Amino acid sequence: MSIKKKTEMNKSIKGSKTEKHLLMAFAGESQARSRYTFFASVAKKEGYEQIAGVFMETAEQEKEHAKRFFSFLEGGMLEITASFPAGIIGSTAENLRAAAAGENEEWTDLYPAFAETAEEEGFKEIAAVFRQIAKVEAEHERRYLALLAHVEDGSVFERTEEIAWQCRNCGYVITSKKAPKLCPACAHPQAYFEPMKTNY
């Protein structure tokens, strides 16, 4: 596979700054994936099934980002110097805030800088991948901040206007300002309700 990569890029990344940036990005995405699975467990315990689901979905997306970055590496050992979050597992609100901050750093600072270096070193495909993944990280931050706002203002299960709420367990839908305490169809608790997705 590395021979194919060299052919596509017309040169090896070995010894380049881009090689180090790819490994740093791979490590960062891999760690984010693990953190998000830890955060999902906390959200579930606190009664936020939707937020737990978002953390797990994002963890899988981070795995795919890590896989993409890893696919450009050409093997061997590589020493890097980098800083990574050594945070704690907090409450759901604290975890959402920490996750949003990490996503923000990736899309506003790290990946644009990595893309610029890759471009300067002649790795246009890698530069494009850094830029495209940065767009995803911006969406991750937006989603985490929206969920955080609902946790902080107590609107995870109650809104000012009527909306469609859907049970994540059985699919039951009810239109109301507030999600029911128990699902009338499957008797799962309110924790399983989320605003119904309508953008299919």
Swiss-Prot record:
Residues annotated to bind Fe(3+) 2: 62, 103, 137, 140
Gene Ontology cellular component annotations, sorted alphabetically: cytoplasm
Residues that bind Fe(3+) 3: 167, 170, 183, 186
Principal subcellular localization: cytoplasm
GO molecular function, one term: oxidoreductase activity
Cofactor (UniProt): Fe(3+)
Domain Rubredoxin-like: 162-200
Keywords per UniProt: Cytoplasm, Electron transport, Iron, Metal-binding, Transport
Induction remark: By exposure to dioxygen and hydrogen peroxide.
Positions annotated to bind Fe(3+) 1: 29, 62, 106, 137
Cofactor note (record): Binds 3 Fe(3+) ions per subunit.
UniProt xrefs under SUPFAM superfamilies: Ferritin-like, Rubredoxin-like
Superkingdom classification of source: Bacteria
InterPro entries from the UniProt entry: Ferritin-like, Ferritin-like_diiron, Ferritin-like_SF, Rr_diiron-bd_dom, Rubredoxin-like_dom, Rubrerythrin, RUBY_RBDX
Localisation: Cytoplasm
Sequence ranges assigned to domain Ferritin-like diiron in this UniProt record: 12-155
GO biological process, one term: response to oxidative stress
Job of this protein: May provide oxidative stress protection via catalytic reduction of intracellular hydrogen peroxide.
Record text on subunit structure and interactions: Homodimer. Possesses two rubredoxin-like centers and two non-sulfur oxo-bridged di-iron centers per dimer.
The name this protein goes by in its record: Rubrerythrin
UniProt organism field: Porphyromonas gingivalis (strain ATCC BAA-308 / W83)
Classification lineage: Bacteria, Pseudomonadati, Bacteroidota, Bacteroidia, Bacteroidales
Name of the coding gene: rbr
